[in-house]
Structures are given as structure tokens and as C-alpha cells.
């Protein structure tokens, strides 16, 4: 009798889990469809943000006709605020939600390649190079960096090649040097570390002394900043990656800080 009750309880739990998954999928489909309507778009984006870790959300977003175009239009609408200091927290949060959804697409193995090939990542670059350091701008900056960090974490050489081709590395170095919030410097240095640990990334950095000197200069500046204690591991890993290259190793003998 007790075994029957246990089996029944287990089956009920399993059925409830299946229903919850099904309901979540239905919710995602509903709000994905509502993104296409300007009147329901903002709320739909905010609702979908809560489900960004669902393993299928990338599929629904990417293959739903007109959805990515609508999200991209919202991104483009914010560009006008990049030349002024009038970006509200409300608008910044909306863009953060969209970029986070892009990250879900970028992380999914079934959509990552198409995401890179679409060049959508490039539309996030202006947020990285924006000069303003108010909280609303930094929210978007760190979220955009998060997409790149998530991509380089996959150990996909094509991601590194894409970053090299689109010449974003100097911008990331600048963020490392001048990041207003510690977390921004940490994310930026993590990206550089992963680039250096890639064969093509290391080759790109070391084939021109100007690039190598640019990185070592930024690393030196960061080491002198006492607020960068939490970033020491990433900095050391970048140095360790660089010395794998013979020429870089010789140059670092003269440029490494004494202590």
C-alpha cells in the first residue's frame, strides 16, 4: 500500500513538473509573439527577461518571424541617447532586458553560429564605447560586456575570430583601464584573458608590438590601482597567457612591474 502511495506521489510530482514546463513554454511563446506589437512590446520584453535561462527561449526568439527585427529596432532607438547624457534608468533597463535576451541566443549552441553570422553583436558595440559613466549607461555597458564574456567562455575559436575581425579589443582595453565600477573591469579583463588564451587571439595580439604594448600598459595601470584587488587573478592569467608567445615573453622581461 505504501509503495503504491509513493509511486502515485512521484507520478503526481512528475506530472506537475511537466505541466510547469509546458506552461512556461506557452508563456514564452505568448510574449515572444507580443514583441511584434509596439503596444505590448515593452511588457513582453520585461516578462521574457524573467525566463531568459529557459533552454528553449533562444529558439523561440530567433526563429519567430519579425521578433529579432523588433528587438533590434528598440536597440537602435537608444542610440540617440549615446551622444547626450539623458538616458533614463527606465530606458536603460529595457535595453538591458533585450541584451540579456540576445545573450540567451548567443549561448544556445543551436543559435550561436547564426547569431554571430548575423552581426547582431556589432550593434552592441556603441554601448561599450559610449563616454558617459552615469549608472544608466553603465548598466547597459556591463550587460553588453556580459554577452561577449558569455561567448568567449564557450571556448569557440570562431567567437575570438569574430572579435578580432570586428576590432573590439581596443575598446575592451579602454574599459579595463577606465571602468567606473569594479565589476566592469572584471568582465572586460576576463574577455581579454580568454582572447589571450586562444591560439588565434594570442597570435593577433603579439603580431604587432603596438597591440602587445597596449595590453601591458593597461595591465600595469590596473595593478597600480588598489581597488582592483578582485581582478588580480584575471590580470595574472593574461600575463601567463602572453608569455606563451616567445616575442611577448622577451618584451615582458622589460615591461613587467617589479612588484
Give the residues covered by each predicted segment.
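Acidic, serine/threonine- and proline-rich low-complexity regulatory regions
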Residues: 180, 198-204, 220-229
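C-terminal transmembrane module of eukaryotic multi-pass membrane proteins
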Residues: 219-259
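Elongated alpha-helical scaffolds that mediate protein-protein interactions in large eukaryotic proteins
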Residues: 4-74, 78-97, 103-127, 131-142, ...
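Preference for well-ordered, secondary-structure-rich cores of eukaryotic proteins
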Residues: 171-180, 215, 219-220
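Alpha-helical membrane segments in multi-pass integral membrane proteins
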Residues: 186-191, 210-220
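Hydrophobic core/packing positions within alpha-helical solenoid repeats
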Residues: 48-49, 95, 102-103, 148, ...
Amino acid at each position: 500500500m505504501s509503495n503504491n502511495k509513493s509511486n502515485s506521489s512521484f507520478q503526481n510530482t512528475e506530472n506537475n513538473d511537466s505541466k510547469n514546463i509546458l506552461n512556461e513554454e506557452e508563456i514564452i511563446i505568448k510574449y515572444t509573439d507580443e514583441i511584434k506589437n509596439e503596444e505590448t512590446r515593452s511588457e513582453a520584453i520585461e516578462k521574457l527577461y524573467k525566463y531568459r535561462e529557459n533552454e528553449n527561449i533562444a529558439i523561440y526568439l530567433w526563429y519567430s518571424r519579425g521578433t529579432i527585427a523588433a528587438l533590434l529596432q528598440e536597440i537602435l532607438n537608444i542610440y540617440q541617447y549615446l551622444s547626450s547624457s539623458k538616458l533614463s534608468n527606465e530606458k536603460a533597463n529595457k535595453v538591458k532586458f533585450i541584451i540579456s535576451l540576445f545573450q540567451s541566443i548567443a549561448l544556445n549552441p543551436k543559435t550561436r553560429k547564426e547569431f554571430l553570422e548575423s552581426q547582431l553583436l556589432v550593434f552592441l558595440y556603441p554601448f561599450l564605447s559610449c563616454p558617459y559613466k552615469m549608472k544608466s549607461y553603465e548598466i547597459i555597458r556591463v550587460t553588453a560586456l556580459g554577452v561577449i564574456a558569455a561567448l568567449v567562455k564557450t571556448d569557440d575559436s570562431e567567437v575570438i575570430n569574430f572579435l578580432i575581425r570586428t576590432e573590439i579589443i581596443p575598446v575592451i582595453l579602454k574599459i579595463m583601464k577606465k571602468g567606473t565600477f569594479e565589476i566592469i573591469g572584471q568582465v572586460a579583463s576576463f574577455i581579454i584573458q580568454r582572447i589571450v588564451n586562444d591560439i588565434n587571439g594570442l597570435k593577433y595580439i603579439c603580431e604587432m608590438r603596438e597591440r602587445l604594448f597596449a595590453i601591458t600598459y593597461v595591465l600595469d595601470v590596473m595593478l597600480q590601482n588598489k581597488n582592483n584587488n578582485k581582478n588580480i587573478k584575471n590580470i595574472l592569467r593574461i600575463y601567463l597567457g602572453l608569455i606563451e608567445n616567445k616575442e611577448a615573453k622577451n618584451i615582458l622581461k622589460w615591461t613587467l612591474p617589479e612588484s
